[in-house]
Amino acid sequence: VLVASADGAGTKLKLAFATGRHDSVGHCLVNHCVNDILVQGARPLFFLDYLAVGEMDEDVVQEVVRGVAVGCKENDCALLGGETAQMRDFYAPGEYDLAGFVVGIVDRSLIIDGSRIESGDLLVGLDSSGLHTNGYTLARRIVFDVMGLSVDDELPGTGRSVGEELLSVHGSYLPVFKRLF
């Protein structure tokens, strides 16, 4: 059975704009989409991206797509292609939007849908690698508005700048999934 998911990089992109670092958002997007299909038991087959920009900055586009390519390689899925749309009158200078689409496969008998949960089943908990692709609007409000930090300030307790920490690539659960199933 084919399983598909589509998602966007969300407001994590605001941090990429503020820091000038664009590689991790593509990688995170792939991990996010792959994690979305893993919950149904599917393994990724292929990925497509959609990058919409105001003005085309080749260096930024290459950095974003390089991150997508690394994410696809690490998740054993082919990057089939995608779309890069230039819309000069739609996006502010230096800003863009990024979305991705993943298709995976799972044997019908192995689809995870909750229907086979029984008393006595083992529940597996996994460590989180931190914020994933969701929650960045709240995180930015806390870090910038409440704590009064900038992207270059050290995030207390991390030894890293706010930008480095919040743009860290979040994990894909595919390696753990492969060991379990």
Please identify what each model-predicted range represents.
Residues 1-181:
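Helix-biased detector of long, well-ordered alpha-helical tracts
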